Amino acid sequence: MITAIVLINTAQGSTAEVAQALIGLPGITEAYSVAGAYDLVAIVRVGDHEKLADLIAGRVQKVSGIVATNTLIAFQAYSQRDLEAMWDIGNDEPIR
């Protein structure tokens, strides 16, 4: 499974419409409006790199209202659950 994070700039006033269009595409599991240099962040999960290329170049970049994209391919996933297990040394007594 390939996971990618797509950073998206949208035309002024089109962020909500772009987000709705994106979440309708197969492979895009989530879309977030964000503050900062980008307007949206989309999370993509697909089976292989060819499907990722088809989705980004063939469908995402053609969504009306998208000005630019920057795609980041994830190498390793970390979550709070993973971090808690990593730092658990087996001592459940509170620190005093």
Tell me the role of every PLM-derived stretch:
Residues M1-R96:
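A compositional/biophysical signature of low hydrophobicity enriched in polar/charged and small residues
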